[in-house]
Amino acid sequence: MSDKKTNNVYYVDASAARGGNGSQEKPFKFINDAAAIALPGDEVIVAPGIYREYVCPENAGTADAPIVYRSEKPLGAVITGAEVLTGWTKHEGNIWTARVNNGIFGTYNPYTTYVCGDWYFAPTVRHTGAVFINDLMMYETVTLDECIAGEADPCAYNQEESKYKWYTEQDGDETVLYANFQGYDPNKEKVEISVRRNIFMPDKNGVNYITVSGFVITKGATTWAPPAAYQDGLIGPHWSKGWIIEDCEVSNSRCCGISLGKYLDPENDMYFYTKHVKSPTQMERDAVCRGQYHGWLKEKVGSHIIRRCHVHHCEQTGIVGRMGAVFSTIEDCHIHHVCNSQQLGGAETAGIKLHAAIDVTIRRNHIHNCIMGVWLDWEAQGARVTQNLMHDNSRPEGREPAKGAMFSNDVFIEVGHGPTLIDNNILLSKVSIIIPSEGIAVVHNLIAGSFGLINSGVDSIVNDQREPRYTPYHIRHRTEVAGFMTILHGDDRIYNNIFLQKYPVDEEKKDPASPENSVVGTACFDIFPSYEEWIANFKMDEEPDMGALATYHFGHLPVWLAGNAYFNGADVCKHEKDALIDTENTATADVVEKDGKYYLDTNIYSLLGDFKNGILNSDILGKAFEPEQRFENPDGSAIIFDKDYFDNNRGLSTIPGPFADEEAAKAVLF
């Protein structure tokens, strides 16, 4: 790599003749030709066209001189991991067949490589490759007979799409494909198969400060990306610092769209899956500690920006990242239809799934029709989920979970110690927030769904004994580990939210310890003490007695609630102060789409009356218990919650929910 700053401009055009030199007069034909030589300060301008290649940047930029790859026309340059497959012949009925010589795949054949690994709970029967008809990712079958039948998958979110099937087998040095195109002639349609594993991703660590702007990035044969493994995607920085991925459309990944994930550690890569003898949770702890040894530091990894991207139709995650996403920002993105086929299943599926989201900001995104919206697992210390619109992150009515599938919700914070802040969001799915964690602040949200996994979802019972799940917490605003602790539960703050029971209560799903709890409100926090009740146990005016206090060292932590509004029977915590409880009116809140823009249709703001509260700030929220860190900005400065969903000023006092006033709630949400 070179830090030499050159400020060259290279041009690329898929329609160019071969042998170009990157000049405007003689552009390169392939983006990777420019990626092999671009140095700090250089810009690569790519003409509209389809680029069937893997782009592997060789050199890093610098903080003041990034290497910029730019589509000349926004979304005009399409980089794809797929190739067109022609020459289909009729097999029988709607079934066609085609053959591909395996030489095209090199050392990685997606049609012999299975989706599998740590935390993968579905059967290991799907390949990393995929077949597409007119940009629709078809559904893989386990047998040819299933492909021939062409029946809808009862678990798929889209029943009609699930009738488009494909099946593969090997015959010598050829991959044989069968496909049910439901009456379409594949020789008259655009039929492609994914060939390349990645689209735009370095093959080594430390290729820092790259900007990728305005591309369509699509159709890669990506692999399952669990947290204690190398995590790939269609595009990603591969364990580096300072990437910007902006104004891109990222879609049709077999597994993950954008990866901000973990490097390859040969001694801890799918350890549980390949060696069996240690638990995957233990290997996650090892991944954190080994990461410290391998340079997981603020100065070397993370601080990426993902902005204004359209991420959709990926089958594991839209955006994934273990440890490599620290100090990053994901903003103004539209993320939807993730893990909808239900062909893949496991504990790593969501619109955004991050482990160790230290000081990560997720803001102003629209996330919908995903198996989950945002899932922050382990070490979401300093993470902030703010000003997002989330809805329909649940299985459609009548769809059952496939084998290995996860539950659904808008925001899931798992086994973290905080401080994690969820503020100024619109959360309209059936289950809004799942928190088998501690140190969570839920502030100024509109919440139409339930809380779930309260005082649950953390430890396992193995050999008739409790096996606590110890997870790390960190030096404030750093990656260095400060300690490990199990989850005591509690230490939560719930202020100035609007709760409404939007969906009917399911009498069989009224358990707040369940991920499918159907009861909206805060009564589920009754099991935790108030601060006054909790602190009294420690007898602060007496000499400490280690034995006597041990009970409370491992007991529940306190909770704080105030200023919330409750509608349609949403229940209320006994510790709540200054609540508005409306038992007379019926509140409504729905997202409405008009001409591609999204609005909120609600009567709530006419029901709030004169109910107001004071402005919150970091000092009022206090510090999360284990890391002893405030709910504050990544730079350590205080947050004053005087701005709403749109950054409108709230004034000297505030109403609950994400909007400063009724008029603000009428504006375009996204």
Name what the model sees in each region.
Residues 410-416, 432-436, 482-486, 550-555:
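Short, contiguous acidic/charged loop-to-helix segments that flank catalytic cores in large enzymes
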Residues 458, 474:
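A conserved amphipathic helix/loop scaffold
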